[in-house]
Amino acid sequence: MQEWNDIYDEYRNRTGRVHLRGTPWKPGEYGLTVCVWVYDGSGHFLLTRRAKGKSFQGTWENTGGAAQAGETSRQAMARELFEETGIRAEESEFEFLGSDRDKCTFYDFYCLKRRISLKRIVLLPGETDAVMWAGYGKIHWMIRTKKICRIIASQFRRQESELKKRNLSK
């Protein structure tokens, strides 16, 4: 199934045009990707392992993905979280952490407090194949040993102070 994404300009305005996922972006075109750090209130974050056949296969990541055409950032976050983990959350439950931009993507970062047994997580076949809770220490070790996807490792480093400011370890 083809996936279409809204095209944004450099100021993050929707252009009214759409982009077919997997095709190159033109200069000055941007997509929107959302990421969430699900935390349990006890200093642990939910991580999933990327399935075989995906880029960065076998590495761990937080939940996220591209917003589809017509979706808001929060709508995309709720959809991605449900698709990849089976966790349902209202858009209003996501706490906004901040945004970033690279050469063709705007990123929105969120956190979500949710205590849930790993047995209740429903992984999306072909996307992820394992799940765990990991604290700051374990995440730092996983970054050093390259067990976390390098893109996610970079995001975590940029978001860590904001996550700690929000006292997500309690």
Predicted features by range, described:
Residues 148-170:
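Charged phosphate-binding loop/patch that engages nucleotide di/tri-phosphates or the phosphate backbone
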Residues 1-35, 39-41:
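Acidic, metal-coordinating catalytic segment for phosphate/diphosphate chemistry
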Residues 33-64:
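A glycine-rich, hydrophobic loop/mini-helix early in the fold
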Residues 7, 38, 47, 111-112, ...:
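Conserved hydrophobic "DFG−1" position in protein kinase catalytic cores
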Residues 66-148:
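Unchanged
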Residues 26-28, 56-61, 132:
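A short, polar/proline- and glycine-enriched secondary-structure boundary/capping micro-motif
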